[in-house]
């Protein structure tokens, strides 16, 4: 079922990807019963005291899929999913794939500002949230978003306290009452392999996130090929420590790549060393994915003697931001296993260093494309290719890089060339080994511990505050997170503005906490370039030593 606003691959490219065997012409959900039949009573998912075998997981996914349809949802619908790492997330994702419902992968850190936009833009018919996480009432927010979104008819809540106006997700996720009938029903309504399997979120520079449409064809290949490159098999035990709705832990190879190969998925609610390192030891974790800030904490915890190194670790993937060489050099000696740098994006292209690469390649580069038909160009400002070794903007296209964002024609005209090349916004150079080295971004993004924040979005929010005349949001270096948000503001005469008041105002707007400024600099005027634009390069130099600061949250 094709949605209006979805940009398909051109027929010539699609035919080529099918002929090459990248696209197998099967929806992702059609593989589940093969997994159950092959791996049966092998443990598939571990979430605290909950352990589900492959057979149990698939029975629950089928049961949930049928009950979602019985609740009024239809194949082709979209569901806003904001669940923490847990068995409910895995089961619901698989159920959606079986029923032809496309999950919109929101983050647990998102608040009403983001959720209302995502729900409206994707025209979701259902929302799935936890009851509470920490001190935040997600159920209450989910109820508000549902009431504000006319298309929503079902609010699902995972947790021990479910309101009378919501539906208990855990109860719906019981095994199918009649497994044979449920399987036959879902097989009959299976989506087309070219349909949207999942909506991922961009780290866009132009305000709120863009929706990335990943089809069953391309996302199945994304996970399958990633698992091949990373060497996952039925003995693999993969730890999900990053938010599971991110592309990285979901399908690079992540949850899907592990389940395809009969491995075990272990879910952690937090990447904090005190929780994760003992869990890795107890479950015999062999592979995991992390961002540089998390890896640094793990290294410090092991090197200081607070925790032993994970004894079974074979593969440590690091991505989401560039890994400093000095940290990369310590990863293998301290944590064990093989370091794999990952440079990828929810929009498609995945670059991996290979496990058998020499140490200098694993430390100094961010990998090479995983597919022979991944096309890359490194170009100058006029889109002319630059010589190998010189820096330029990265363009790409391939069998798992979509040709456009969802319902974003105007943005697509800027983000994609007429012949389908995606402008990634990354500045790279080609290493003599053929790998890519990431030098930075040509887009206005702030990378806070792997979460990409649009400077423009933060600026537009601060502009709503009384007395703000001009504002620029820039990245400030952070020793743990890599970068954090610094707001540089010009105020109208007589206006008093503090960091605390800005954060309080944005919190009241229901903005995700990780987007809140952590530094504020009030200035008389903003520096401008020769063409009258705010000179952010100069501002980044200024904020290095002149901002009032709060502790990173």
Curated annotation (Swiss-Prot):
The keyword DNA-binding is annotated on this UniProt entry: no
Molecular function GO labels: acyltransferase activity, transferring groups other than amino-acyl groups; ATP binding; medium-chain fatty acid-CoA ligase activity; nucleotidyltransferase activity
Phenotype of null mutants: Cells lacking this gene are unable to degrade salicylate.
Pfam families given in the database record: AMP-binding, AMP-binding_C
Protein family per UniProt: Belongs to the ATP-dependent AMP-binding enzyme family.
Catalytic activity: salicylate + ATP + CoA = 2-hydroxybenzoyl-CoA + AMP + diphosphate
E.C. number(s) listed in UniProt: 6.2.1.65
Keywords in alphabetical order: Aromatic hydrocarbons catabolism, ATP-binding, Ligase, Nucleotide-binding
Gene Ontology biological process: catabolic process; fatty acid metabolic process
Function: Involved in the degradation of salicylate via a pathway involving coenzyme A derivative. Catalyzes the conversion of salicylate to salicyloyl-CoA via the formation of a salicylate-adenylate intermediate. The substrate specificity is strong, since benzoate, 3-hydroxybenzoate, 4-hydroxybenzoate, gentisate, 2-aminobenzoate, aminobenzoate, salicylamide, salicylaldoxime and 2-hydroxyphenyl acetate cannot substitute for salicylate.
Residues annotated to bind ATP: 203, 320, 342, 426, 441, 533
Protein known as: Salicylyl-CoA synthase / salicylate adenylyltransferase
Induction behaviour: By salicylate.
Domain of life of the source: Bacteria
């Amino acid at each position: 079922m094709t949605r209006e606003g979805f940009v398909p691959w051109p027929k010539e490219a699609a035919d080529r990807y099918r002929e090459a065997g990248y696209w197998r012409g099967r929806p992702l959900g059609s593989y589940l019963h093969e997994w159950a039949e092959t791996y049966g009573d092998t443990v598939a998912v571990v979430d605290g005291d909950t352990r589900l075998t492959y057979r149990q997981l698939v029975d629950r996914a089928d049961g949930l899929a049928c009950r979602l349809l019985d609740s009024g949802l239809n194949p082709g619908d979209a569901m806003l999913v904001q669940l923490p790492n847990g068995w409910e997330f895995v089961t619901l994702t698989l159920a959606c794939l079986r029923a032809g419902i496309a999950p919109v992968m929101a983050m647990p850190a998102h608040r009403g500002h983001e959720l209302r936009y995502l729900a409206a833009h994707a025209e979701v018919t259902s929302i799935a949230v936890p009851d509470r996480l920490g001190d935040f009432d997600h159920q209450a927010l989910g109820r508000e978003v549902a009431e504000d979104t006319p298309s929503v008819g079902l609010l699902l809540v995972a947790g021990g306290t479910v309101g009378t106006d919501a539906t208990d997700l855990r109860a719906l996720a019981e095994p199918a009452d009649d497994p044979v009938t449920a399987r036959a029903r879902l097989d009959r309504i299976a989506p087309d392999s070219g349909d949207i399997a999942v909506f991922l979120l961009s780290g866009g520079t132009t305000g709120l996130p863009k929706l990335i449409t990943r089809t069953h064809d391309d996302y199945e290949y994304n996970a399958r090929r990633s698992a091949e490159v990373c060497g996952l098999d039925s003995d693999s035990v993969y730890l999900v420590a990053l938010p599971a709705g991110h592309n990285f832990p979901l399908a690079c190879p992540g949850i899907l790549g592990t389940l395809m190969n009969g491995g075990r998925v272990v879910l952690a609610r937090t990447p904090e060393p005190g929780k994760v390192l003992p869990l890795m030891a107890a479950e015999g974790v062999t592979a995991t994915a992390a961002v540089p800030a998390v890896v640094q904490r793990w290294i410090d915890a092991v090197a200081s003697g607070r925790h032993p190194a994970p004894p079974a670790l074979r593969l440590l993937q690091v991505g989401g931001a560039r890994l400093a060489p000095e940290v990369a050099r310590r990863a293998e000696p301290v944590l064990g296993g093989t370091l794999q740098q990952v440079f990828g994006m929810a929009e498609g292209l995945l670059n991996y260093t290979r496990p058998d690469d020499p140490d200098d390649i694993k430390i100094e580069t961010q990998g090479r494309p995983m597919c022979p038909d991944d096309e890359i160009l490194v170009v100058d400002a006029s889109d002319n290719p630059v010589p190998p070794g010189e820096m330029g903007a990265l363009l790409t296209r391939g069998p798992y890089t979509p040709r456009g964002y969802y319902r974003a024609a105007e943005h697509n005209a800027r983000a994609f060339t007429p012949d389908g090349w995606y402008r990634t916004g990354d500045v790279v150079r080609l290493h003599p080994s053929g790998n890519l080295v990431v030098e930075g971004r040509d887009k206005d993004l702030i990378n806070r511990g792997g979460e990409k924040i649009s400077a423009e979005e933060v600026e537009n929010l601060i502009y709503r505050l009384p007395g703000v005349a001009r504002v620029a949001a820039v990245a400030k270096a952070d020793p743990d997170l890599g970068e954090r948000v610094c707001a540089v503001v010009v105020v109208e005469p007589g206006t008093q503005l503090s960091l605390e008041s800005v954060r309080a105002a944005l919190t009241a707007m229901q903005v995700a906490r990780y987007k809140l400024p952590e530094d504020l600099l009030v200035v008389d005027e903003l520096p401008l370039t020769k063409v009258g634009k705010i000179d952010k390069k100069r501002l980044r130099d200024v904020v290095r030593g002149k901002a009032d600061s709060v502790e990173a949250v």
